[in-house]
Swiss-Prot record:
InterPro entries: AB_hydrolase_1, AB_hydrolase_fold. This is Ethanol acetyltransferase 1. It catalyses: ethanol + acetyl-CoA = ethyl acetate + CoA; acetyl-CoA + H2O = acetate + CoA + H(+); ethyl acetate + H2O = ethanol + acetate + H(+). One of its GO terms (cellular component) is mitochondrion. Keywords: Hydrolase, Mitochondrion, Transferase, Transit peptide.
Amino acid sequence: MLLAYTVRPSNWSFTRRAYSATARAFNQQKGLLPLPIKETVDMAYDLHLPERSVIGKMPYHSPEPIIFYHGLLGSKRNYRHDCKKLATALQTPVYTVDIRNHGSSEHALPFDYNTLVNDLVHFAETHSLGKVNLVGYSLGAKVAMLACLKHPERFSAACIIDNSPEEQPHIKPLLTALVKSCVKLLDHHNVRADDKLWRHKASEALKKYIPDAGIRYYLLSNIINNPRVVEYRSPVINYDDGMLHFKNPVRHMMDFVTKEVAAWPTQELEGKQFLGPVNFIKATRSDFINPKSLQAINQYFPYHNIDEINATHFILNERPQEYLRAVTDFFKVTRYQLEKKREQDLAKIDQLNASESLKSARD
């Protein structure tokens, strides 16, 4: 029997601190209730264990589990079936998490890449996971890359799905449109939660801004129309007002998508590399990974592989079997090929250093 455990944070104690000037000014301008400030949050998660284990009963803390990190406006629920398959195919536990301001996790500031990396490290430490493998998609992919570069001792390997380690001003319009369309749905279309046609009306409202039906379906998966099923009650969302709401504090997230989502801390990461194996899955009809991205990928991740799949950026929804096969093949085969190449390169360096030392001693 396949096992899955769901855990939600409860009884959070909020750290009361002054907001950053940017966040405070933005919230005041929009007349928003303030989000609490927390350096780290305990992310909600699902734990998926293999359906059939070749080693009998799988221990809870198996070596090198996988943490699956979703994208902007995603959640662990979107990929629970995929992660169940991964757990069985790879015979390892797979944790799917909700990042802050998503799914069942706490709504809090700051909401930036460094904070999301801190949440990830906090999660691994809290659950005593040791070294782990990462699978990240879109926003989650950028967090995974940053985590590997800033904390290489904590991560063994990573699978990066359609994102690259660089500044990406060209992706900002798409991601801004996603969040802005959600805000417009709430602010300009009074769809009641008890309306039997709420899903159709919400989809039609989003259609004005998001013509792609698949993307609208992705966004609609975040809507709450029944306050009794809310797993986390946000301090800035009134679930009992009879209207539709998103699981995300989308109004508060606009500052992130306009200023942070396309960023990359080039200066902070100068000279840093992650020497573990990394697999990039590129969607061929997406520009999140483009020819110019290869230089940055080579710079930060010298032991990498790139798989290509015919899809748009929403590759997980469009090509689930193909991307799962690519992830599985990487962790089963390609990662070990890359590790072997790394060991060969290190052996050559050691040999050269030994030769230089011997030559110096003779001189």
